[in-house]
């Protein structure tokens, strides 16, 4: 990994881009658009004008993760059956590795057990200390911030999430009205994502509160343990209900209209472009000042490039790295839309039925960044989505080639420095504007001429 000089507290203007896409029933034209990269240099990139996603070019939307193994712990001494590995997904290039389940431990430790290290679940959350997140809880815990999790549904009864999950919405038409029911081929995914954002742990006999930390002493504690989760369920990877073309815009609009300040989308597609039906919803979120964080995608799931919604201008796209801060071969992908990278391997999270799951994927990296954004929103409540995005990218530790690159984006996220930056003097989202993109590109679509019968 090559490091370059870091630039802090200065406006960074991200690439203005559009996804490359060719559809059988459409043709596209290419227009040159000037984009500024950094505050002191400009670059001209030729940006492909993209046509609407054709009906014959199916977009597959799925969670971005690889389940490794069910963890042996549960709040009940008997692990829940729902914590078993999920079935193989349609887009998985190879079967997900089975991993090795960790040795089963008692849910009730002996009296006098250490109260400083927490239980085995908590100890596995290496990112909390290694990235300085625990030190930020004296300044912010996410209290008063609502984060929408647009995913497979969230189990609000899990002890590590109980009380932090609001009554949400089902955008699919086949789930529970409140968004609490797991749906699709990976029904546990949304619960895992939510726990990394706003898990608060739970009480277990023999453990007492950890000094200086919010929440309970055992189980998963999220980056923003006092934030509220607004669950919005989608049906992905299985048939039934509404189409993804309908589900996504409905989900985004519901999140915005029901108080979400940040939206997490740990889901991705096999296309860099997106249906035109999504445009207005993402523009609406932009206009209302809601920050959207999305996972980049995983090579291990057969994705070789970032796919929508992570390619949409203005979305803060998160790639994955391993514990050595190297881009993960299987748990990340590449693309010019990546903004920052965060841990995505050897993760542990809460799973429905009072269980836990060991997993990897950019699905796990995104909620860590979302959680930090929630801390920043509490600490700086008057800052806009553009300013929050600026904090996160300007404070990142440059990695890979100097400057922004398609593997690390602006670099490895740095929660402590993001919190410490002076208020960014930016008015526009440094990652682009979907509203501007629509104005430039959607109006210039040209249909393929119909061949003459003559």
Report the location of each language-model feature.
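C-terminal subdomain of the subtilisin-like protease fold in secreted/lumenal serine endopeptidases
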Residues: 381-453
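Active-site core segment of subtilase-fold serine proteases
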Residues: 108-226
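Structural recognition of the beta-strand scaffold that forms the well-ordered cores
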Residues: 146-149, 195, 228-233, 256, ...
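Hydrolase catalytic cores
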Residues: 344-412
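Secretory targeting and sorting signals
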Residues: 2-77
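Protease zymogen maturation seam
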Residues: 34, 56, 65-144, 159-160
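Active-site-adjacent substrate-recognition loops and nearby beta-strands
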Residues: 295-313, 319-337, 349-360, 401-407
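Substrate-binding/access-modulating region of protease and related hydrolase catalytic domains
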Residues: 232-308, 355-359
């Amino acid at each position: 990994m090559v490091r370059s000089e870091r630039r802090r507290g200065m406006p960074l203007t991200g690439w203005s881009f559009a996804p490359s896409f060719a559809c059988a029933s459409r043709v596209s034209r290419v227009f040159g658009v000037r984009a500024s990269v950094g505050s002191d240099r400009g670059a001209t990139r030729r940006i492909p004008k993209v046509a609407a996603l054709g009906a014959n070019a199916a977009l597959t939307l799925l969670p971005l993760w690889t389940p490794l193994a069910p963890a042996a712990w549960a709040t009940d001494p008997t692990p829940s059956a729902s914590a078993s590995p999920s079935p193989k997904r349609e887009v998985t290039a190879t079967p997900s590795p089975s991993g090795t389940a960790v040795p089963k431990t008692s849910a009730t430790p002996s009296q006098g057990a250490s109260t400083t290290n927490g239980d085995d679940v908590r100890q596995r959350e290496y990112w909390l200390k290694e990235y300085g997140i625990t030190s930020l809880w004296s300044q912010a815990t996410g209290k008063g911030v609502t984060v929408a999790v647009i995913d497979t549904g969230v189990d609000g009864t899990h002890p590590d999430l109980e009380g932090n999950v609001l009554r949400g919405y089902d955008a699919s038409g086949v789930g529970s009205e409140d968004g609490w029911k797991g749906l699709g081929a990976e029904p546990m995914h949304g619960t895992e994502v939510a726990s990394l954002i706003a898990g608060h742990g739970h009480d277990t006999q023999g453990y007492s509160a950890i000094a200086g930390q919010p929440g309970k002493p055992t189980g998963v504690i999220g980056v923003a343990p006092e934030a509220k989760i607004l669950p919005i369920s989608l049906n992905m990877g299985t048939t039934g209900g509404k189409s993804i073309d309908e589900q996504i815009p409905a989900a985004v609009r519901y999140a915005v209209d029901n108080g979400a300040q940040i939206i997490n989308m740990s889901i991705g597609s096999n296309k860099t472009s997106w249906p035109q039906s999504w445009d207005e919803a993402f523009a609406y979120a932009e206009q209302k000042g809601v920050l959207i964080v999305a996972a980049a995608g995983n090579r291990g799931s057969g994705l070789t490039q970032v796919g929508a919604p992570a390619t949409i201008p203005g979305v803060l796209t998160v790639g994955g790295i391993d514990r050595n801060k190297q881009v993960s071969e299987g748990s990340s992908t590449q693309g010019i839309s990546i903004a920052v990278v965060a841990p995505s391997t050897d993760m542990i999270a809460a799973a429905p039925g009072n269980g836990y799951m060991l997993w990897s994927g950019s699905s796990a990296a995104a909620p860590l960044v979302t959680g930090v954004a929630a801390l920043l929103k509490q600490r700086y409540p008057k800052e806009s989505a553009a300013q929050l995005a600026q904090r996160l990218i300007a404070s990142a530790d440059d990695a890979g080639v100097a400057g922004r690159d398609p593997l690390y984006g602006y670099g490895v996220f740095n929660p402590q420095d993001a919190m410490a930056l002076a208020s960014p003097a930016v008015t526009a989202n440094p990652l682009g504007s979907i509203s501007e993109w629509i104005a430039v590109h959607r109006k210039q679509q040209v249909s393929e001429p119909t061949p003459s019968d003559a």
